[in-house]
Amino acid sequence: RRHQNNRMSNHILKRPTLGANVLLLLVVAFIVVALNTRFWGIVFDSPGLAGLHGSGVIAAIAAALFALTLLMVLPLSLRWTFKPGLTLVLILAAGAAYFIGDYGAVIDRHALASVYETDAREAGEWLNLRMLLSIGALGLLPAAFVWWARVDWQQPTREIFSRLKLALLAFALLGVAALGFGKDVASLLRNHMELRHIANPFALLAANLSYLDHARNDNRPLAKVGLDARRGAALPPGDRPLVLVLAIGESMRAASLDLNGYARDTDFDLHPLPVVNFGKVSSCGTNTATSLPCMFSDLGRRGYDDATAKHRENVLDVLV
């Protein structure tokens, strides 16, 4: 009986053997379905997608997203990069899905700049149990399956040929989607501009490429401003340096401050202080990489451009 139980256990835990293309397609399908819940929520809630025609538009969007994701992971499908590459894609896509779903974030160049240019302390504030569980369930568990499954590798030439067929399949899906429902998809994207920034993991790749391209062209000379600035009479005389401390919370919503008329007592610690409240200030953006430099720029909210501001002095440079 013990021998029989061992055989049953081995049978239950038997590692599946899959072709490389099959495993690749399973991973792509999982990403498209499970790691794009907010994307699909917006699509399904969009008006005008009822009936047979609407189903066709949704199918075209699914085909296009599947094809783009497949084309993204195909370069990682060589034998020695196959499982590590899929693991990396799954974990990164799971992380992006968490921030897109739980924080309503969009994945663009500015969001990545906020991530890449932060410090360890601020990054640690994002870590929580919900985040770890989400990435574990949607990233690490599928990655564990990828490593657990055996891959039935064919001869190198046959593997290359099979990947080429997958690439042709992806381009065919894109072509059919564009020819059949291209105008409808374009209209949906115009009405919901955020879709292109939450299509996971395509948005992640596009944002990284944009960030790298922006950084590569980051060699313009620094434009000086406020050259006529002088030390004012109100400042104390002498050579001792004047220290100015700025505590900035650029992500605070002005509408949620009771100083601005909010019903709840949200900033009671400020009440005893001689606060000068500017209640009609608007941010240049919803991300740190844009809103924080804009606070100190002379370009103004309407004229602000992060590429220009990066090569232009601001009020802090003038004060120093």
Which residue ranges define each predicted feature?
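Transmembrane and membrane-interface helices of multi-pass
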Residues: 8-199
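Active-site-proximal alpha/beta segments of enzymes that process anionic O-linked groups
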Residues: 178-243, 251-320
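Residue-identity detector for glutamine
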Residues: 3-4, 154-155, 222, 313
